[in-house]
Amino acid sequence: QLAKLQNGSDIRGVAIQTEGGRSIDLTPDAAYAIGRAFARVLKAKLNKDDIRVCMGRDSRLSGEMLCAALGAGLNAEGASVYDAGLATTPAMFMATVTEGFMFDGSVMATASHLPYERNGFKFFTAKGGFEKADIKEILTIAETLYADGANTAFTAEKIDFMGVYAAQLVGAIRRGTNKERPLEGMRII
């Protein structure tokens, strides 16, 4: 049942019921099982038991609910969870390689350009985004863990990674243009 959530190297599904739309298939129970499975896969990939995972989400209505369930699943497998709140997909990758953060893994809750009722997850380590085979492994494991009534109470430390990431971007643009105010005098149309 969870295997159908695979969309290449992402997980995508319907998280909000709409009139005449597809049935919900990315539920909190599914997100909980996916969180547990991601923790197991990450521990095996890194060959370590104590893992730190950062979660971020876009502004979709279902994001907070799905992250709570995913975070609870991560906690259930012993992962320390850090909540970056509203974030961008590139920022979640950068959270794995930025000094002072260097998370073992990160997850972005997003469905990119898809309609509002959809949502999903993208997974990262310092080596980059998870690939199709990794997602298949997560969903195969999650299927064995899937149960109704999953726990969605989770513990996470809230962090401000977006402020750090934004400062990195500003610095890179200033260095690249050799200007303190590289956009000064330009008009956006």
Language-model regions, residue ranges each:
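Positively charged, low-complexity intrinsically disordered leader regions
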Residues: Q1-A33
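Glycine-centered structural positions embedded in regular secondary structure
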Residues: G13, A31, G35-A39, G73, ...
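Phosphate/oxyanion-binding active-site loops and adjacent basic polyanion-contact surfaces
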Residues: L26-G35, A39, T88, K158-A166
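Glycine-rich phosphate/diphosphate-binding loops that line cofactor/substrate pockets in enzymes
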Residues: I34-V53, R174-E184
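Predominant activation on well-ordered alpha-helical scaffold segments within soluble catalytic domains
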Residues: G35-A39, G71, N75, F93, ...
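Ferredoxin-reductase
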Residues: L46-A126
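Gly/Ser/Thr-enriched, mixed-charge loops and adjacent short helices
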Residues: N119-I189
